[in-house]
Amino acid sequence: METILSLKNLDKRFGRVHAVNNLSFDIQKGNVYGILGPNGSGKSTTLGIILNVVNKTSGEFSWFDGNLSTHQALKKVGAIIERPNFYPYMTAIQNLSLICKIKEISTEKIEEKLKIVNLFERRNSKFKTYSLGMKQRLAIASALLNNPEILILDEPTNGLDPQGIHEIREIIQKIAKNGTTILLASHLLDEVEKVCSHVVVIREGVKLYSGRVDEMSASHGLFELNTNEPKNKLISILNNNSNIGSVREEGDLVVAYLTTEMEATDINNYLFKNGITVSHLVKRKPSLEEQFLDLTNNN
């Protein structure tokens, strides 16, 4: 499979701030990738580096299996990394025509791209009459004008109402089905889960996970426990079990994440032998949100 983008040991410092820390991952053709992390985790900085907007401190990245220079490769890239900025008194057609002129590309695809983002009926409306969601959709249309092989989006639904969020996500999925590779940055786990096939989880510039979204939630499960004994005693004994990767308190319960397969009867016997009688014991699969929190809290 063709590698659209490859990052190797990418690093960026802003003074004392280590924004991107030895980051490596590959983007394969035809997939939808999400860079997921809390605000300030280095997502936008990473996108800025690969788009030649931000200078890297060290490391390297290459486009299209290294066969093209960054300048040549960016002609095959569509990107939105800032708020949409169009002329308010110009129509959608006029604004996109101007972009085509600046990029020195044909205007023949304008109506096609407006249909993709569901703005064809408003093609002759002035930009100032658009809602925030419509403005974002027009920005996506502008990024598609050069028929890019990869579309890069930075927080594409940020600030939108639920309807606007739903529309943008549907458009992203539609574009992906047409064969365009997509890389988006988001702090919303729900967004990545619904839209992306692959995810790179980062925190403070460090990669915590890279792989398929569905494999991120594929684990050996977790135990929810409670006891009348002191909680710190239960937690200490659980932490001493080699089958358990991490333990944390959630309200009245103690949650233990498994690293290998283990049945409820096994953990019950183990605790009983160590002087703990449980009043509540349930085994279940963790949600993607719980997996994400476990990653970010324990790395």
Specify the residue positions occupied by each region the protein language model found.
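C-terminal end-of-chain micro-motif
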Residues: 11, 297-299
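ABC transporter nucleotide-binding domains
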Residues: 2-5, 12-184, 189-203, 207-209
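Short low-complexity, flexible loop/linker segments enriched in glycine and/or proline
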Residues: 200, 294-297
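ABC transporter nucleotide-binding domain
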Residues: 169-255
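Residues that cap or initiate secondary-structure elements
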Residues: 18, 31, 106, 123, ...
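Short, charged/small-residue-rich alpha-helical element at the C-terminal edge
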Residues: 222-295
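Structural motif detector for alpha-helix initiation sites
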Residues: 92, 213, 285-289
